[in-house]
Amino acid sequence: MFSEYLKFFLYGLIQGLTEFFPVSSTAHLKVISVFFGIDDPGPSLSAIIQLGSVLALVCYFRNDFFKLKIQSSKKIFDYLIHERLLRSIFIGTIPIILLGGTIKLFVPYFFDEIFRSNLSIALVSFLMAILMYIADRSKKGSINLKNHKYSDSFLIGLSQALAIFPGVSRSGVTISTALLSGWGRSDSAKFSFLLGMPAISFAAIVEFISSFNAFSSFSFFPLIVGLTTTFLSSLLAIHFLLKYFSSNGLKLFIIYRIVFGFVILLNL
């Protein structure tokens, strides 16, 4: 029997690591809950725990949004916002807000049966492995955070909208789309992470509003343990992937997604 603290620690650890590794956090939270015999956290709890990942993104990439400048004449701090990057993130976030918001408003239980099933998650894992393989084998381009077009941001944002389907992996599909569009490895991962900040926040806010009563059933201190674990494991995942991916590509994660898919199928 898992204690509440251990259960939320496990939720946070899995969420933090798999949110940024291209392997799907939603799929792992669901499958791990079955493996350990604990409750599926469901979309509401998953969304609120994801806020730990958002905080990790803010901390890790704070210098990509703000440049600190000390004005000697006025002796005040003036934060210069990287406007182009913020515009790109805004443009790339539009598709997932439109699609996710539409589904939540008009068909709120769209994913509960078919798309959250283990069979569906396994099949999506195989499809993502194929996409990631094609992207990893594509010719490496020179598009980066400084010279990209807003149309690049929108295209990657369109792919991010697919991440509302359980098992897709937001980072996996956006990194793959960036690589196929001619982005370099390092900046494709970096932009994917930055683009995830408003998307993850939006999901958490929508779930909080639509399932407000459900949050009263969560114990406060175990939830804090989950959020803290998510934050710390997210920082580790971001740092590791940026270092590893720039030199090694997606090979390790492609193999993992195939194995993960077969493990799910064998346990149906």
From Swiss-Prot:
From its record, what is one biological process in GO terms?
Answer: peptidoglycan biosynthetic process
Q: Does the keyword Membrane apply?
A: yes
Q: Which InterPro entries match?
A: UppP
TM helices/strands, residue ranges = 41-61, 89-109, 114-134, 155-175, 191-211, 218-238, 248-268
For this record, an example GO cellular component is: plasma membrane
Tell me its EC number(s), please.
3.6.1.27
> What PANTHER family does this protein map onto?
UNDECAPRENYL-DIPHOSPHATASE (PTHR30622:SF4)
Give the misc comment: Bacitracin is thought to be involved in the inhibition of peptidoglycan synthesis by sequestering undecaprenyl diphosphate, thereby reducing the pool of lipid carrier available.
**Stated role:** Catalyzes the dephosphorylation of undecaprenyl diphosphate (UPP). Confers resistance to bacitracin.
Protein name listed in UniProt: Undecaprenyl-diphosphatase
Gene assigned in the entry? uppP
